[in-house]
Amino acid sequence: MAKKIAGYVKLQVPAGDAKPAPPIGPALGQRGLNIMEFCKAFNAKTAQMEKGTPIPVVITAYADRSFTFEMKLPPVSYFLKKASGIQSGAKTTGRGFIGKVTKAQVREIAEKKLPDLNCQSVDAAATMIEGSARSMGLQVVE
């Protein structure tokens, strides 16, 4: 028989830098999960990744206080910032551009993120990522 699911916890944790401090500690403590066990397992899985990369994690908490977790790829904004070389997005969207990304870079990001997005084709994913780029204040050029 399958374990009874008690709930889900969604977090964004820096790769290789999971600590029992907030936001991880309180989120897992509420569900009665072993915080250090998660931190060690997460840090071990993300050891080969670039340290500090934000990794979205979905933790499935079970009624017997055990858990499993699934890691996703970093957010689109992380890839766009890296591709354009900016530190943060525009303060006000639609009032000029603070950087540029090429359609080739957008397509490359779309190919990476396709499993995490709710679309079937790379073209649809590229369109979504272009919209994210524009809302961050990035100009999409040929």
UniProtKB/Swiss-Prot annotation:
One of its GO terms (biological process) is translation. Forms part of the ribosomal stalk which helps the ribosome interact with GTP-bound translation factors. This is Large ribosomal subunit protein uL11. The gene is rplK. Part of the ribosomal stalk of the 50S ribosomal subunit. Interacts with L10 and the large rRNA to form the base of the stalk. L10 forms an elongated spine to which L12 dimers bind in a sequential fashion forming a multimeric L10(L12)X complex. Keywords: Methylation, Ribonucleoprotein, Ribosomal protein, RNA-binding, rRNA-binding. InterPro entries: Ribosomal_uL11, Ribosomal_uL11_bac-typ, Ribosomal_uL11_C, Ribosomal_uL11_C_sf, Ribosomal_uL11_N, Ribosomal_uL11_N_sf. Belongs to the universal ribosomal protein uL11 family. It comes from Beijerinckia indica subsp. indica (strain ATCC 9039 / DSM 1715 / NCIMB 8712). GO terms for cellular component: cytosolic large ribosomal subunit. The keyword Aminoacyl-tRNA synthetase does not apply. Coiled coil: none annotated. It holds the Pfam family Ribosomal_L11_N. GO terms for molecular function: large ribosomal subunit rRNA binding; structural constituent of ribosome. One or more lysine residues are methylated.
